Structures are given as structure tokens and as C-alpha cells.
């Protein structure tokens, strides 16, 4: 599996570091599409390559402005418009990558199922939904939701308990 972070941790545009990626920006789009297609072209014939993966919880970067993890804003979904731009760009990259390499599946890496409704609408050409899941003992409704709402295979790109107390040896 070969992963491109797709702007998750910021990027440099015209020599200026942008810590929070704005996926609707024309220069950002151009850079990310260029890098993703270059990756596909460079590695398409690599023996043992399972799939290409774009991103790493990029949906969380839509509202987390720094290194500190904050609560996900459930009521205030200002990030929804930004999410739509991001997932459209993911799909556009996948289409361009498939034009270069039709032999490998293309996946995105989402933080759990946040914005799954938008993923289903905007990422129709993605082959596999990669997801980082920290729900604890069970994956809950994850399989049912993805099957019903998106209909694509799921790849656990990370999983585990949300928090583990080393003293009590239990989940927090």
C-alpha cells in the first residue's frame, strides 16, 4: 500500500507553508493532483503494490487547526462545505490516477465515518474506504453503515480503543 497524505499535515504553496489545507483553492488542487498522479505514474509497476491510498484522517483536519486534538464539532458543521471540496478533490485525483494505473485499487483514508454521506456523494470512483477507527471493544455499526450508505469495501487503516488507562488496564 502506498499512501500520499494529500495535504493532511499542510503543504507549501508558492514557497509559503500552509498548515491547514484549503481544498477549494486552485493552487492547492493543482499541486495535490500533480503529486497524486506523479505517485501513480512512478509506482504503478511496483511488484507487490496492493493499492494506492490518499490521505490520513483529512476530514479531522477540516476543523482541527493545530496539533492539539479537540472535540469534533457536532452542532457547528462549518466544515461541511470544506469537506465537500476535499472529497470532490479526492475523487478527481482517483479518476486521474486510474487513467494512469487501472491495475490497482484506489482508496482514501477517513477518520472513522465522519462525513460518510458526503463521501458517498462525492467519491463514487474510489474503490475502497480506508478508515481509522478507535471505537473500543466493537466496531459498532461501521460495517452496516458503509454497506448501506456507500457500498464499498472497508479497509482498517488504523484501529484500536479510543483511550486506554495503563493503570487500571481498561478503556477510558
Predicted ranges, named:
Residues 1-129, 139-140, 147-149:
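Active-site mouth of glycoside hydrolases
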Residues 34-37, 128-172:
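Catalytic-core region of carbohydrate-active enzymes that cleave or remodel glycosidic bonds
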Amino acid at each position: 500500500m502506498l499512501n500520499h497524505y494529500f495535504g493532511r499535515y499542510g503543504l507549501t504553496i508558492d514557497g509559503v507553508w500552509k498548515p491547514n489545507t484549503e481544498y477549494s483553492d486552485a493552487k492547492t488542487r493543482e499541486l495535490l493532483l500533480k503529486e497524486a498522479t506523479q505517485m501513480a505514474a512512478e509506482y504503478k509497476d511496483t511488484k507487490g503494490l496492493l493499492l494506492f491510498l490518499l490521505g490520513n484522517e483529512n476530514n479531522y483536519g477540516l476543523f482541527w487547526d493545530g496539533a492539539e486534538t479537540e472535540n469534533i464539532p457536532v452542532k457547528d458543521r462549518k466544515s461541511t462545505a470544506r469537506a465537500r471540496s476535499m472529497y470532490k478533490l479526492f475523487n478527481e485525483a482517483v479518476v486521474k490516477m486510474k487513467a494512469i494505473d487501472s491495475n490497482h485499487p484506489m482508496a482514501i483514508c477517513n477518520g472513522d465515518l465522519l462525513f460518510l454521506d458526503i463521501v458517498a456523494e462525492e467519491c463514487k470512483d474510489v474503490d475502497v474506504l480506508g478508515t481509522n477507527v478507535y471505537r473500543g471493544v466493537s466496531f459498532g455499526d461501521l460495517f452496516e453503515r458503509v454497506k448501506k450508505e456507500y457500498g464499498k469495501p472497508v479497509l482498517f487503516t488504523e484501529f484500536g480503543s479510543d483511550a486506554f488507562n495503563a493503570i487500571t488496564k481498561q478503556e477510558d
